[in-house]
Amino acid sequence: MKVIFNADDFGLTQGVNQGIVKAHLDGVVKSTTLMVGMPAEQHAVQLAKQLPDLKIGLHLRFTAGRPLTGERNLTDEHGVFTAYRDFWQRRDYQPEAIYHEAIAQVEHFLKLGLTLSHLDSHHHAHTHPQLAPIIYEVAKKYHVPLRDIGMAGEEAFGCRYHFTDFFYDQRLGIDPLMKHLLELKERFDLVEVMCHPAFVDPLLEKCSGYAKQREEELHILTSAQLIQLLVAHDIEITDYSALISAPLHSCV
């Protein structure tokens, strides 16, 4: 079985960026997704350009920060994206607004001089029933894979693929992670593990309720024990680059 450890939130804060880089250089992370238009975007880009083996995707934003397009249909009265707690209840999004914002974020990413490996989204926003079909079309337009959510048992990317958000908060630990991966190994060829390694900084503590746990994730993802166990169980660490030319399947 192959596993993609994808680090979300690249570009959120400098501490997040530095944690992701350490998880790449000293650990199992070979893939990350950048949040364009966020405070540490340029810092992330500078780091990324020094790391040719770190594959960079786009972490689409529809629940954090401000839209690049200024589309009012996507925001609250202050011009900020609809808060996460309200986002999932909304059913009045305009398809054109969603499409234009997604395209703007992809184009912004490309203008940074980075190679786009795949798409996913902050808070899994691309699985919202109004966003899902539109973001799928955006992924097709740019010929990149789109993170698959909740398709256990079905084929994606031409193989038995599964996305897991198991490695999070109360479930953090080498033993639970390995147990989970070995269970998945029975059924899947490719597993993507969502992760959030970081060094906690003041901005992260201010903007995220998930902060201290990120340092625990970083410790685990750079653990020699984890790397040895993956090798011992014939689990290969990979990234999205092998999937660029693979068939693109719907994420929902």
Swiss-Prot record:
Gene Ontology MF term list:
deacetylase activity; hydrolase activity, acting on carbon-nitrogen (but not peptide) bonds, in linear amides; metal ion binding
- Gene3D superfamilies cross-referenced by the UniProt entry: Glycoside hydrolase/deacetylase
Which EC number applies? 3.5.1.-
Binding residues for Mg(2+) = 59, 122
Question: What broad class of enzyme is this?
Answer: hydrolase
Q: According to its UniProt record, which protein family does this protein belong to?
A: Belongs to the YdjC deacetylase family.
NCBIfam families named among the record's database cross-references: PRK02134.1
The UniProt function text for this chain reads: Probably catalyzes the deacetylation of acetylated carbohydrates an important step in the degradation of oligosaccharides.
Known PANTHER family for this protein?
A: CARBOHYDRATE DEACETYLASE (PTHR31609:SF1), YDJC DEACETYLASE FAMILY MEMBER (PTHR31609)
User: Which HAMAP family does its entry note?
Assistant: COD (MF_01246)
Name the record gives this protein: Carbohydrate deacetylase
